């Protein structure tokens, strides 16, 4: 995966078990967001592949790809919502899979007594937004909009959740609520991959992968993230630790690096390499 002469991602291999909870950390520009864009096919690979159930994601038909995407829920730092619509409709889009089902949206608009409207209200209440279903999304704060995005995941109930820096622009209360909700979805069976900059949040995950300059340099328990390793991960990052460890503190990651990129997830298996 390249954006210039230097590869944005190189020699990345990740294997994720169904139902696993995984955090991806690294300095700004380490390749975290690029990895997530590749997994959602938002950007094209220059080499390697992404496969679903053994089939290359880049060779699937539009219909087949749509079926895969219905199983994947996404949440981003920049809220992927329609700001002009009420919060409740943005949540409902998680169930209908986009703007295609106008009938479902009209059902919601028909009134607060409809079954869908009640379910949306209950979901928004679960994320701390009771009574906001008919509030225009653009009129909500940034933290509230992120909660709307999480509520949409609750309605969608995806098998795989890809969360790209979901806490970067929200307040501590929202961070805690969003984290708890994502973990609840994970406990209910969803596989959870979260791209993070905050190591303190990453320590709540049983497994952490660290990228630096597009390559994996750590894959394991957060308990093994020593200050020396964190210094190497965040070297040169104004939001991380500037010092780079001495060569003797660097560690062998050959066990975690095979090929160029590979991801395996879910009952059918999702992989990229």
Give the ranges of each region predicted by the language model:
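Helix-to-loop junction immediately C-terminal to a conserved catalytic motif
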Residues: 40
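Catalytic Walker B motif of ABC-type/P-loop ATPase nucleotide-binding domains
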Residues: 161-164
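Conserved ABC ATPase signature
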Residues: 136-140, 144
């Amino acid at each position: 995966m390249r954006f210039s002469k230097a590869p944005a991602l190189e020699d990345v291999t990740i294997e994720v078990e169904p139902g696993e909870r995984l955090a991806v950390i690294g300095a700004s520009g380490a390749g975290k967001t690029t990895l997530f864009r590749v997994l959602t096919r938002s950007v094209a690979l220059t080499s390697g592949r992404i496969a679903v159930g053994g089939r290359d994601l880049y060779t699937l038909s539009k219909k087949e790809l749509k079926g895969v995407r219905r199983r994947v829920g996404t949440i981003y730092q920049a809220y992927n919502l329609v700001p002009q619509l009420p919060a409740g409709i943005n949540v409902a889009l998680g169930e209908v899979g986009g703007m295609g089902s106008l009938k479902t949206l009209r059902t919601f608009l028909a009134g607060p007594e409809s079954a869908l409207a009640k379910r949306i209200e209950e979901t928004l209440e679960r994320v701390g937004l009771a009574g906001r279903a008919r509030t225009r999304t653009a009129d909500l704060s940034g933290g509230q909009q992120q909660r709307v995005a999480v509520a949409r995941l609750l309605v969608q109930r995806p098998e795989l959740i890809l969360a790209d820096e979901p806490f970067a622009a929200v307040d501590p209360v929202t961070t805690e609520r969003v984290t708890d909700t994502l973990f609840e979805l994970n406990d209910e069976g969803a596989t959870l991959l979260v791209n993070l900059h905050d190591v303190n949040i990453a320590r709540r995950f049983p497994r952490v992968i660290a990228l630096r300059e597009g390559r994996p340099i750590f894959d394991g328990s957060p308990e093994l993230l020593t200050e020396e390793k964190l210094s190497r991960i965040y070297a040169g990052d104004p939001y991380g630790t500037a010092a780079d460890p001495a060569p003797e503190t660097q560690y062998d990651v050959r066990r975690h690096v095979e090929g160029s990129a590979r991801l395996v997830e879910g009952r059918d298996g999702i992989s990229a390499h």
